[in-house]
Regions:
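Helical scaffold of the NTase/Pol beta-like nucleotidyltransferase catalytic core
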Residues: 1-51, 163
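Catalytic cores of NTP-dependent nucleotidyl/adenyl transfer enzymes across multiple folds
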Residues: 2, 116-169
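Short, flexible turn/loop "capping" segments at secondary-structure junctions
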Residues: 12-16, 60-63, 104
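Metal-dependent nucleotidyltransferase catalytic core
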Residues: 20-39, 71-109
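Active-site nucleotide-donor binding segment shared across nucleotidyl transfer reactions
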Residues: 38-78
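Short, flexible, solvent-exposed loop/turn segments with mixed acidic/basic and small polar residues
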Residues: 54-61, 100-103, 117
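Catalytic cores of processing enzymes, dominated by hydrolases/peptidases
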Residues: 102-123
Length: 169
């Protein structure tokens, strides 16, 4: 698994406005799981399932968004993307290993992220790490509050924190 570290100038594109961090909300998780069930019904013909991902899945404070990760096999990559493009009527962002779709539900920003290759390996590895290391998960949550004064600083800290963990695995 290749760990990616952005150059310092990459973060200059982010604003210096604060990142609103909200405490974990169990009602939001229940609603997100319902959304995920509906998404998985739509995905059923592809044989791919969306997994709730990120802070909400870990029951941590976060930005209040709902994130879903999908890991299609190579032969299911394009059928999955085709289905999602038709459903969401477009793509938010795309590169070789990550395609992101945006939606909104019940006042929450929703990200549906399709991953493959090293990006998928990194995503799975960090979630597994946090599930197994409660102390690191608590440190991650505390760091969100320490670095939320600026979106630029928040993402610089978060990306490097995750890269440090992945390099240690």
């Amino acid at each position: 698994m290749r760990v990616v570290r952005e150059q310092p100038e990459y973060y200059e594109m982010f604003s210096t406005r604060p990142v609103p961090i909200r405490p974990f909300d169990p009602d939001s998780k229940r609603a997100a799981l319902d959304y995920g069930a509906r998404l998985n019904e739509r995905l059923a013909p592809t044989g791919v399932a969306a997994e709730l991902h990120g802070s909400l899945a870990l029951e941590l404070a976060g930005k209040g968004e709902w994130e879903y990760s999908l890991y299609p096999s190579p032969d299911r990559w394009y059928p999955t993307l085709t289905l999602l493009v038709n459903h969401f009527r477009g793509v938010y962002s795309m590169d070789e290993e990550v395609v992101m779709f945006n939606d909104a539900c019940a006042g929450h920003h929703v990200e549906v992220i399709v991953l493959r290759g090293d990006a998928a390996a990194r995503n799975r590895a960090i979630m597994q790490y946090w599930r197994e290391h409660l102390d690191a998960r608590a440190d991650y949550e505390a760091g969100k509050y320490r670095h939320c004064h600026s979106k630029r600083d928040y993402y610089r800290w978060k990306d490097n924190y995750i890269a440090d963990i992945l390099e240690s695995l």
